[in-house]
Amino acid sequence: MRIGVVGDPDVVVGFRLAGLTDVYEVKSPEQAAKAIEELNNNSEIGLIITTERIGEQIRDSISGVKKIVVEVPDKNGPIVRENDPVKVLVRNAVGVDIK
């Protein structure tokens, strides 16, 4: 299993330095959606990493992906969400609200 990365220049440089080769540097949502599609169609790729900002821009494209997609913060830091999906899942499963 290989890992694919889709991100802006600042994000992908770190993954290239770590030795990953399936790295797509994108500058628009259209490029990102195309890169995600290419990685999704590659049978050797099992995990796709992208940034939260790109994930928000191409949410519809990501929702159809059959691989594991992980969204990481970019150089500007994490996106603060009103309803964090992980917090909602924990609250529903455990009955405790995480602050």
From Swiss-Prot:
Transmembrane segments: none annotated. The gene is atpF. The lineage of its organism: Archaea, Methanobacteriati, Methanobacteriota, Methanomada group, Methanococci. Belongs to the V-ATPase F subunit family. It is a peripheral membrane protein. It comes from Methanococcus maripaludis (strain C6 / ATCC BAA-1332). One of its GO terms (cellular component) is plasma membrane. Has multiple subunits with at least A(3), B(3), C, D, E, F, H, I and proteolipid K(x). Pfam families: ATP-synt_F (PF01990). Keywords: ATP synthesis, Cell membrane, Hydrogen ion transport, Ion transport, Membrane, Transport. GO terms for molecular function: ATP binding; proton-transporting ATP synthase activity, rotational mechanism; proton-transporting ATPase activity, rotational mechanism. Its main location: membrane. This is A-type ATP synthase subunit F. InterPro entries: ATPase_V1-cplx_f_g_su, ATPase_V1-cplx_fsu_bac/arc, ATPase_V1_fsu_sf. It is found in: Cell membrane. Component of the A-type ATP synthase that produces ATP from ADP in the presence of a proton gradient across the membrane. The keyword Membrane applies. One of its GO terms (biological process) is proton motive force-driven plasma membrane ATP synthesis.
